[in-house]
């Protein structure tokens, strides 16, 4: 039986966290003894961790003090919280988990670092390192870096050096289509007019403020519609204030976090991704699985999400181009129907089992 340690920053409602839970449920407990190290012990997914997974957390929550401790004393934290030897260690998200596990110097342990975001667009991991050189060194301590899209791999190589990606792997996030379709029937969502849905953490990268600006423009155009934004995050209050101050409550509804967002997606006429920066957008793939037309801004991983445009419509990453694309759905019925056909074509791509097997093969060390 192999001993495997996974590390992740939190168990908040992000795509990486959902993928990790899927992976933990997939791995055979008869083959693997699994330990999960959560750097900041916060998040909604703790109750969904399989019982056979042993869980440890370092800090109760995110804080400036905790960030400083990781930046200054990662090796000490490693020694304190990783007291056993493991066959495999996986830092499943860039940032603190990657920094801490890089301190392992056991030559018998294979170490993997997962990359879910384009750090070249927003270098949000820098706060955990004393210098850029220290971050490069941390990545160099891993046997392999695994990227969730080819676009992220390319951006990482440009930022940190091509030598770090020469032994890299690209592994797309797995999604269980049958479960998503079943959960999409769990409850009813009102649908009495043209409905647009957007799903994601309410953070600057997701572009929900500019989507709200587009909503206001469409109201001024006299269009009748509903925009449902499903998610929560640090920019939620600012988004709520913008909706209220611009008197958009009749059209734009902030749903907040939903453990099961799929009925909102399924009952939409259009799914919109307004992101400024992405890694591999799970919600887009979920919309495609449900056969919902998709319009997305062009950012890291989106072309791979949408089969280079075969399964959805990709626009230049500007507010104006996104507005015009959404407007076409009102003005050109044939355009929306074409998007529907694209999404349905993408929905039959069943890649769940194959992607999970590839991740397991990487953990087993059989994928070069």
Regions flagged by a language model, labelled:
Residues 91-97, 115:
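Short His-centered aromatic/hydrophobic patch
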Residues 293-296:
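Short hydrophobic beta-strand element within catalytic cores of glycosyltransferases
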Residues 6-14, 18, 22, 26, ...:
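N-terminal strand-loop element at the rim of the active site
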Residues 14-22, 194-217, 223, 234-240:
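A conserved mid-protein helix/loop that constitutes part of the nucleotide-sugar donor-binding site
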Residues 99-101, 140-167:
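A short, active-site helix/loop in glycosyltransferases that binds the activated sugar's phosphate group
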Residues 308-319, 328-334:
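Conserved acidic donor-binding segment of nucleotide-sugar-dependent glycosyltransferases
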Residues 240-256:
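Nucleotide-activated donor-binding/catalytic signature segment of Leloir-type glycosyltransferases, i.e.
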Residues 257, 276:
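Aromatic "clamp/platform" in nucleotide-sugar-dependent glycosyltransferases that forms part
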